[in-house]
Amino acid sequence: MRNTMNLTNLLAPWLDCPELADITVQSLELDSRQVKQGDTFVAIVGHVVDGRQYIEKAIEQGANAVIAQSCQQYPSGLVRYQQNVVIVYLEKLDEKLSQLAGRLYQHPEMSLIGVTGTNGKTTITQLIAQWLELAGQKAAVMGTTGNGFLNALQPAANTTGNAVEIQKTLADLQQQGAKATALEVSSHGLVQGRVKALQFAAGVFTNLSRDHLDYHGTMEAYAKAKMTLFTEHQCQHAIINLDDEVGAQWFQELQQGVGVSLFPQDASVKALWASSVAYAESGITIEFDGCFGQGRLHAPLIGEFNATNLLLALATLLALGVDKQALLDSAASLRPVLGRMELFQVNSKAKVVVDYAHTPDALEKALQALRVHCTGHLWAIFGCGGDRDKGKRPMMAEIAERLADHVVLTDDNPRSEDPTMIVQDMLAGLTRADSAVVEHDRFSALQYALDNAQADDIILLAGKGHEDYQVLKHQTVHYSDRESAQQLLGISS
C-alpha cells in the first residue's frame, strides 16, 4: 500500500501551512511529462533544466498541487493558485528533495549500502546482493545496469536516479521483501544531493581515476564529491580501498573506516587484507587476514581488480554482521556481472571478453588482468564517447598500445561529434600511427579481430559492457557487444 500524506504535514519541517491540510499527496513527480491525475508536481531548479517553466504543463496534465523552488518574485512560504491548483514555494527545494521524498515514501527500514568510486561500483553492488541472497537474505541493487532484484532488473536512466525516484524505488523494494539494497552512488548524485536523506549502514569507496571532468572540472572537485558520502551523509561503516592513493588518504581521516588491501597490513590497522591471491582461468582464490580473522575463498571471477572487488564486498558484509562461514562457503556460487569482464568462448577461436571499461584506469586494469590469463596475443577494441572528456582519448590509446599486442579503434556513442575526429584525438596518443587499425563499426571491428586472431588469443571488447545501444548524432540505435560476441562466435543467447 503506497503511503499518502497531506501537504501540510509533508512540508511541516520547513513551512507552517495549515490551510493545505485537505490536499493529499500520494506521488511526487519531477517531470511534467510524467504527471498523472492526482500527482504532486515538484518544480526544482536542476543542473540543466528549470522545472518551474513547466508548472502550467503539469497542471494541464492533472497535478493536484505544485511544490516549487522559491525565487525573488515568489519567496519561500508563499502560497498562490493557478487554475485553482495550489502552488507553494520553498527555498533550496533542490537540496531538500531527498528529505521531502523520504517523508512521503517513508525512509525504508532496510540496510542500505552505498558504493562510490570511478570503477567497480556495479560489480561490488551486485556481488553484495548476490552474496546476501546466497546467505538467505533478500537483496536488491540500484545502479547502472538497472534497479531491483538481480533476476528482474528494471532499466535505469542514470547510475544514481533523482532523489524522488530513489525514495520511491526503495519503498517499492521494501514492499517486495528486500532486507538490503546496494546502491551505486555517483559523484553527480552526491553533488546534487540525490541521496542526502538516506541512512547508509555502510559506504564503500572503490577507487578514484580520471572520469567526469566535463562535469566536475578538476580531479580535486571530483574527489571532494566522492568523499561527501562519508563526511556529509549518514554512513555507519566506511569500507575503503587502501590500494588506491585517495582511499589511503581518506582512511586516515575517517573514524568509521575499515580498510581493504591486496597487500598485508600492520596488525594495528583496522583492515581486511589478502595474505595470498592466486589467479587461474577458473577464477580467483584469496586467503585473507585482518580485523575479521582469517579465511579462504574461491570465486569464478577474472582479474586483479576483481580480487579487490571481492574483498571490498566481503569486508562490507562482515562489518554488517553477516556470518563469515556462510559467505566463504557460498563464494564459489558468485557469478560475473553482465558486461563486466564477461567471457565468451568456443573451441578453436579466440576468447572474447566484454567489459564496460571506458576510462583510462579501467582500460589499463582490464588489459593487465587479461594479460595474466593470456597465453597468446592480447587484443584491445575500444572507442571514446562523443561530447565527453576529450583529454582521456589519447591516454586510452597510449594504454592500449602499451599493454595490448593489437589495437582496433572503433566508435562508442559518438553522439553529436564526428566519429573520425574522435578517432583522430585517440590516434594522437600513439607512438606509431600504424600500431592501430581503425574500424568505426563495432561489429565489424570484432569480426576483423576474430578473423585475424589465433585460438589462444584474448580479445577485449571494451566500453559498452551491458549497454544495448549506440548513441549517434540524430538517433540511438540498437547495438550490443554481448550480442556481437555471441553471434560471431556462434553461441546461442
Curated annotation (Swiss-Prot):
It is found in: Cytoplasm. The keyword Transmembrane does not apply. One of its GO terms (molecular function) is UDP-N-acetylmuramoylalanyl-D-glutamate-2,6-diaminopimelate ligase activity. The modification N6-carboxylysine is found at K226. Pathway: Cell wall biogenesis; peptidoglycan biosynthesis. ATP binds at G117, T118, N119, G120, K121, T122, T123. A motif (Meso-diaminopimelate recognition motif) lies at residues 412-415. Its cofactor is Mg(2+). Keywords: ATP-binding, Cell cycle, Cell division, Cell shape, Cell wall biogenesis/degradation, Cytoplasm, Ligase, Magnesium, Nucleotide-binding, Peptidoglycan synthesis. One of its GO terms (cellular component) is cytoplasm. Its EC number is 6.3.2.13. It is an enzyme of class 6 (ligase). Carboxylation is probably crucial for Mg(2+) binding and, consequently, for the gamma-phosphate positioning of ATP. It catalyses: UDP-N-acetyl-alpha-D-muramoyl-L-alanyl-D-glutamate + meso-2,6-diaminopimelate + ATP = UDP-N-acetyl-alpha-D-muramoyl-L-alanyl-gamma-D-glutamyl-meso-2,6-diaminopimelate + ADP + phosphate + H(+). Meso-2,6-diaminopimelate binds at R388, D412, N413, P414, R415, G463, E467. UDP-N-acetyl-alpha-D-muramoyl-L-alanyl-D-glutamate binds at L30, S32, N158, T159, T160, S186, Q192, R194. The keyword Nucleus does not apply. It holds the Pfam family Mur_ligase. Signal peptide: none annotated. GO terms for biological process: cell division; cell wall organization; peptidoglycan biosynthetic process; regulation of cell shape. Catalyzes the addition of meso-diaminopimelic acid to the nucleotide precursor UDP-N-acetylmuramoyl-L-alanyl-D-glutamate (UMAG) in the biosynthesis of bacterial cell-wall peptidoglycan. HAMAP family: MurE. Belongs to the MurCDEF family. MurE subfamily. This is UDP-N-acetylmuramoyl-L-alanyl-D-glutamate--2,6-diaminopimelate ligase.
